[in-house]
C-alpha cells in the first residue's frame, strides 16, 4: 500500500508539472498569434496578491453526514497571471505560498490538536468579466493544485512536530476553486473558496468510516502591473 501511494503521488506531481508547462506553452502561443491588446487594455496582465485564509478540514462520513473542524487563520502571498481571450472571457493563474490548517478536539480526550500547513499553490480559473463603469466584476471557477512544503502541529501541552515530514497530512492537494473579484484596472479585491478533493490525511492521521478534505475561505487584495 505504501508503494502504491508513493506511485500515485509521483504520478499526480508529474501531471501538475505537465499541465503547468502546457498552460505556459498555450498562453505563449496565443499571445504570439493574437493582438497584444483587447478593448484598449493589455491582453496579458501580471500582478501580486495577498490574502487572508480561514481554513479547516471537512470529514465526509460513510453514512452521508459531514462535519467540519474548527477554523484557523492563515494567509497567502504570490504572483498572479491573467490572459484575456476577448473583452469578457479570461483565464487566471499564478503561483502562491498559502498558509492553511485546522484545529480539532482529541477524540475521547481533553486535548486540542492544532495544525498549520504551508503549501506552494497554483490556481487555474476561468472568469467572465462584467464591466460596470470604472470597475470590472468577475466571477471565477476552476481548480487549484497544491503541494505542502512546511508546517507544524501539536497537541495541547506537547511538543510540536512537522506536518508533512511526520506524515500527519498528505502533501498533495487539489480541488475546486471559485470566487468573485472586482478590479479597476490596477487594484483587485476578491472573496472566494477552495474545496479540496484529494484525501488530506496522512499515515499518522487515522480516520475511520469516511474521508477528509481541506476547506478554505479567503479574502484577497492584489495589484496589477
Where are these regions (language model features)?
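Charged, low-complexity C-terminal accessory regions
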Residues: 140-174
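Gram-negative (and chloroplast) outer-membrane scaffold detector with strong preference
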Residues: 40-45, 52-58, 82-153, 216-225
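Residues that define the transmembrane beta-barrel architecture of outer-membrane proteins
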Residues: 42-44, 69-75, 116-122, 135, ...
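Cleavable N-terminal export/targeting peptides
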Residues: 1-42
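First exposed extracellular module after export/assembly in secreted or surface-exposed proteins
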Residues: 35, 126-128, 134, 157-161, ...
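Short glycine/proline- and aromatic-enriched beta-strand/turn motifs that initiate or cap beta-hairpins
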Residues: 32-74
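Predominantly the C-terminal beta-signal and adjacent terminal strand-loop region
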Residues: 94-96, 100-102, 165-167, 171-225
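Extracellular loop and loop/strand-boundary signature of outer-membrane beta-barrel proteins
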Residues: 62-67, 107-114, 161-166, 203-209
